């Protein structure tokens, strides 16, 4: 069942179709598992270490490559007023935000952790999705919840370490 509308962009132009399909399948599975509303949208971009470093520098003031960055559209910024969209009669789909994954960093980490690139891409996609849904790992209690849910989803899908 297709729950998510995923706008996928491969900036690397060399990610195998089966890797893209795997990540889409995992995200669809996770969306169903987490009971995300059907028709919900997100964008997924695969980029290089250089590409993600540029984004990390520009938006997070960290001048280094990272594995995954998520930009949640429903996250409140400082000084923003919360809007209750339920007050409006809108037929627009829910847009969660953007997940950006460095395929180079995924490959490096897969080697470091001793598992497949597919497992690492799946992990990063679910990690990014959970951030879009408001989960975080800045505090130990938050980390326990988020990482526990990540493992639960990946294990249920069959993509274990």
Curated annotation (Swiss-Prot):
Pfam families in the cross-refs: YbeY
Coiled coil regions, renumbered to chain: none
Protein's GO biological process: rRNA processing
Cofactor(s) it depends on: Zn(2+)
One cellular component term from this protein's GO annotations in UniProt: cytoplasm
Enzyme Commission number, as recorded: 3.1.-.-
One Gene Ontology MF term: zinc ion binding
Domain of life: Bacteria
Residues that, per the record, bind Zn(2+): 127, 131, 137
Key word ATP-binding present: no
Keyword tags: Cytoplasm, Endonuclease, Hydrolase, Metal-binding, Nuclease, Ribosome biogenesis, rRNA processing, Zinc
SUPFAM superfamilies (UniProt xref): Metalloproteases ('zincins'), catalytic domain
PROSITE patterns noted in UniProt: UPF0054 (PS01306)
Localization of this protein: Cytoplasm
Cofactor binding: number and manner: Binds 1 zinc ion.
Function: Single strand-specific metallo-endoribonuclease involved in late-stage 70S ribosome quality control and in maturation of the 3' terminus of the 16S rRNA.
Family statement: Belongs to the endoribonuclease YbeY family.
PANTHER family assigned: ENDORIBONUCLEASE YBEY, CHLOROPLASTIC
Cross-referenced NCBIfam families: rRNA maturation RNase YbeY (TIGR00043)
Protein name from the UniProt record: Endoribonuclease YbeY
Underlying gene: ybeY
């Amino acid at each position: 069942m297709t729950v998510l509308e995923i706008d996928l962009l491969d900036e690397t132009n060399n990610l195998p179709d089966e890797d893209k399909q795997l990540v889409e399948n995992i995200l669809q599975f996770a969306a169903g598992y987490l009971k995300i509303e059907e028709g919900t949208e997100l964008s997924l971009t695969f980029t290089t270490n250089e590409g993600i470093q540029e984004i990390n520098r520009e938006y997070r003031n960290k001048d280094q490559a990272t594995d995954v960055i998520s930009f949640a559209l429903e996250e409140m910024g400082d000084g923003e007023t919360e809007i209750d969209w339920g007050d409006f009669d809108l037929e627009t789909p829910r847009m969660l935000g953007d997940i950006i994954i460095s395929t180079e960093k995924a490959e490096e980490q897969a080697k470091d952790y001793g598992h497949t690139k597919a497992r690492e891409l799946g992990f990063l996609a679910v990690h990014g999705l959970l951030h879009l849904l408001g989960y975080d790992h800045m505090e130990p209690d938050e980390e326990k919840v988020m990482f526990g849910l990540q493992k639960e989803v990946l294990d249920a899908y069959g993509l274990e370490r």
